[in-house]
From Swiss-Prot:
Annotated positions of the Phosphothreonine modification: 538
Region of interest (Disordered), ranges: 419-468, 494-872
Compositionally biased residues, Low complexity: 442-453, 735-747
Name of the protein this chain belongs to: Tetratricopeptide repeat protein 14 homolog
Segments traversing the membrane: none
Organism: Drosophila melanogaster (Fruit fly)
Taxon lineage: Eukaryota, Metazoa, Ecdysozoa, Arthropoda, Hexapoda
Length: 872
């Protein structure tokens, strides 16, 4: 085992490791190694930051080090350290980066300077620059940087560094060999005597007090002797505008994946099996190693450079493209895509022979590569043309023949070869070989190494558009007698562009996971979208209007037009009918609306429809009238003038429903007397009050306008009262009952007449005598006892205001004994109460005066009123 490494481990882990070592390996093991006196200074510094929670982890780690000491500290692991000469040579392969503080911008600069100066120690070698010669033969210098291997940038720190004359050493010599004194801007190699980080002072010497190395020379030195990292940044501003990572990625050494040298510099062999388990160090047989994995890794590294080279090639940056492609081939010499791209680059620059060499290598590795065959054929044609211009007909014929051997259907090569055959000069020089002239068979003796031509027929069948007129065309024109055409420049004729088909697609497929070219793809996609939008706009703008007219279906348009005209005519006829009807008899009552679809409100049956046939006259009248509202009292039928009967339309005639009489026979219901349409314009007093209707069946479903019209038209309850208010602003609540079909439907429900009193008017009233018109009926076996007669059921009450208030009845279920004064509000269990909305009963007298005017109240009425107020 390596005793030095064990001593360093003991000094780092301290006495706990020593105790465990003695327990595991014996007490005399360390004594035999000569490790009786170990320096535990490092452990004592680390001990300050230990925590109790990590005590178990430290114990396990110490046990592992003691048990596996033979594997961890084996001497054979570091026995193959390279020689110093090889190490010195390997230093040039490493990236020389500027110190990290050069890129760092610290807010507290003083604190940063003190931290960097604290890293310097006595005896370190630094490079300085002379600023001036002070009195007393003191040399004032400015520190620049430290010598390798320590990298520290000191040029931005305002340090006062002094070199006394006693520590100058020998003076430098001039060109004649005479000693001279130090001058400004001289670069000196010095050694640190004393350092004070707080005061930022340095004391230097040039005699080597601490470093007794004969090869190291102090004193005057040249700028070339400065470290490489400083020579790169001495002209740059501090802090640097670029980032540390960007500079690292730019370095050529950083992109070199060859790690074998790094292994050797550290004494490790790359082909050895390095393991802490001894039985795994024997290794595996060489034939079991997967060379394909290593090749795949190298090709992935190379494809990055290939992609960059292709991008430079397309942008016209040929120098950068060559650098990237050469770098890719250095990493992976068998990279076919790099060979094809570099061959195309050579051919585009006019170096046809070099390009053909790269194409042949690519086809040797992959003889079915489409781009390699295609580009090689184009290069051979361009080479043949250049030979024709130089009047080297034999070489031109051979180039065209090689192209036809590679691509038998190449049209330009065949035409050029035929033209050379027809020329007299070419017939004497061309060697006759039928296999080469026909081009139907492939020759292995040609310059190309391909044997398959099935995959390039489509690409070779179409000639390039940028290829100029060949040599045979000029000869042909001479024989026909036409004008002679000038020969186009050879460079322009031989140029061809690199197609973006398999090469770029394969490169991008392999680099898709690395996502290096995603931005370029997005930009290209945006450009394509813009072009498509522009094309669509231009198409829409330049589209012929005649074509648009051809696309129109005129029959469908006429059909739609006829529909619209018919609908407008029917609307006009309907409007004309309504106007004529209004002129004839519509002043008294507006025409009824046309039949509409049944809504949920109209289609819903009332509660008394589910019970059975009714024997009362009022129920018959309601059924005959359609169930909307009962007829008015007979007393008021004669007070209004009957309007002239308007001609009824077919949809206005209502059919009378069937009704079951007392004997159980079905008969037509008796027709109800029609309602008086419109409002009478008599001088009677009209109520302006808004009586709150609590009807559960209709008023909640109707709107405000419909509700108000129903209150004024269809109310079957009319109460007349004379209001005698003490104040002009006194408002009375007119709460009169209204016939609700719901309250008469369930005849046989227990407790139906429990709240009979609540259906009467809340106002203080006197009972009327039975109506002489509606006679009281005789008892019937089909009607339960104590059923109210129609006369008493729809009896009106006299209120004390001469207002005709039309309102629906309140809800059926109310409390039995409610306060009966005019200020009481119906707050039953099923009613909705709004305390902010109160119905105001305001009556207009026939003479035009307000009901609120002070009138002398009757005596009886006044007494009754005072009595009610006392009870309230």
């Amino acid at each position: 085992m390596n005793f030095d490494y064990i001593g360093q481990a003991l000094g780092y882990h301290g006495q706990p490791l020593q105790k465990i070592w003695d327990d595991e390996r014996g007490v005399d093991d360390l004594r035999l190694m000569g490790l009786t006196q170990v320096n535990y200074g490092v452990y004592q510094e680390r001990q300050k930051y230990f925590t109790f929670q990590e005590r178990a982890k430290r114990l396990k780690m110490h046990q592992f080090l003691a048990r596996k000491a033979t594997d961890l500290y084996d001497r054979t692991l570091v026995a193959n350290v390279m020689e110093d000469s090889l190490l010195a040579q390997g230093n040039t392969y490493m990236t020389q980066m500027a110190p990290f503080e050069f890129f760092l911008n610290v807010k507290d600069k003083r604190k940063g300077w003190a931290h960097r100066l604290s890293a310097l120690k006595q005896g370190d070698i630094i490079y300085t620059q002379v600023t001036r010669l002070a009195s007393g033969n003191r040399l004032i210098v400015k520190p620049l940087c430290t010598a390798e291997p320590k990298h520290a940038y000191l040029a931005d720190i305002p340090i006062k560094a002094v070199i006394l004359q006693d520590f100058w050493g020998p003076l430098p010599l001039d060109k004649q060999g005479n000693p001279r004194s130090f001058v400004q801007n001289d670069i000196l190699r010095c050694e640190i005597n004393n350092i004070s980080a707080d005061t930022e002072r340095l004391s230097l010497n040039m005699i080597g007090m601490f470093n007794k190395v004969p090869d190291l020379k102090f004193g005057l030195c040249d700028f070339k002797e400065l470290p490489k990292y400083y020579s790169k940044i001495h002209n740059l501003d501090h802090p640097s505008a670029s980032h540390y990572e960007d500079e690292l990625n730019k370095a050529l050494e950083f992109e070199n994946p060859n790690y074998d040298l790094l292994f050797q510099m550290n004494g490790l062999q790359p082909n050895e099996n390095l393991s802490l388990m001894s039985y795994l160090r024997a290794g595996f047989p060489e034939e079991e190693n997967a060379a394909e994995l290593r090749q795949k890794q190298a090709s992935q590294w190379a494809f990055r450079s290939v992609a960059d080279g292709i991008e430079h090639f397309k942008n016209g940056q040929q120098v950068e493209a060559f650098q990237c492609l050469n770098k890719a081939l250095n990493i992976d010499p068998r990279n076919v895509e790099a060979l094809v791209a570099r061959g195309a680059l050579y051919a585009n620059r006019g170096s046809f022979l070099k390009g053909l060499q790269d194409f042949e290598k690519a086809l040797h590795l992959n003889k079915y590569h489409v781009n390699a065959r295609k580009y090689m054929g184009e290069t051979l044609v361009a080479l043949g043309r250049s030979y024709e211009e130089e009047n080297r007909i034999a070489e031109a014929v051979k180039a065209y023949s090689d192209c036809l051997n590679l691509l038998p259907l190449h049209e330009e090569a065949r035409q050029s070869l035929d033209a050379l055959h027809r020329s007299g000069d070419g017939k004497r020089r061309i060697s006759t070989e039928p296999s080469n002239m026909t081009g139907g068979q492939s020759s292995d003796e040609s310059s190309s190494s391909s044997a398959s031509d099935s995959e390039c027929e489509d690409s070779a069948g179409k000639p390039k558009s940028n290829i100029s007129q060949p040599f045979y065309a000029q000869h042909k024109l001479k024989q026909s007698g036409d004008e002679k055409l000038a020969v186009i420049d050879a460079h322009k004729a031989n140029e061809f562009r690199l197609d973006d088909d398999e090469t770029v697609s394969s490169v991008r497929k392999l680099l898709r996971e690395a996502s290096k070219h995603k931005k370029a793809k997005k930009k290209g996609k945006k450009k394509k979208d813009k072009k498509e939008r522009r094309r669509s706009r231009t198409k829409s703008e330049t589209e012929d209007p005649i074509e648009l007219l051809k696309k129109i279906d005129f029959q469908e348009a006429l059909r739609q037009d006829n529909k619209l005209m018919n609908s407008t005519r029917s609307d006009e006829e309907r409007k004309a009918k309504i106007k004529s009807y209004l002129k004839e008899g519509g002043k008294e009552s507006p025409p009824p609306p046309p039949p509409m679809k049944k809504t949920a409100v109209s289609s819903r049956k009332s509660s008394f429809d589910n019970v059975g046939p009714s024997t009362s006259r009022h129920a018959a009248s309601v059924v005959g009238f359609g169930g909307a509202q009962p007829p008015p009292a007979p007393k008021f039928l004669g007070q209004k003038k009957h309007p002239e009967p308007a001609p009824k339309l077919s949809f206005q005639i209502k059919k009378r429903p069937l009704q079951m009489d007392k004997l159980g026979m079905l008969r037509l219901a008796a027709p109800a007397e029609p309602l008086k349409g419109g409002r009478s314009s008599s001088s009677r007093s009209r109520s302006r009050s808004r009586s709150r209707s609590r009807s559960r069946s209709r008023n909640r479903r109707l709107g405000r306008s419909t509700r108000s019209s129903l209150r004024s038209r269809r109310s079957g309850s009319r109460s007349r009262s004379i209001s005698r208010s003490r104040s002009r602003r006194r408002r009375t609540y007119s709460r009169s009952r209204s016939p609700s079909p719901r309250s008469y439907g369930n005849r046989f429900v227990i407790g139906r007449y429990r709240n009979r009193r609540t259906r009467r008017s809340r106002s203080f009233h006197r009972r009327r005598s039975p109506s002489p018109i509606l006679k009281r009926r005789s008892p019937s076996p089909f009607v339960p006892r104590r059923t109210p007669s129609p006369a008493s059921r729809y009896r009106r009450s006299r209120s004390r205001s001469r207002s005709r208030s039309r309102s629906r009845s309140p809800r059926r279920f109310q409390s039995r004994y409610m306060p009966r004064d005019r200020g009481s509000v119906n707050r039953s269990r099923y009613s909705w109460h709004n305390p902010h909305k109160r119905s105001v009963s305001r009556t207009v007298e026939p003479n035009g005066k307000d009901e609120r005017a002070a009138t002398p109240p009757k005596k009886g009425v006044a007494d009754d009123r005072s009595g009610r107020e006392e009870r309230a």
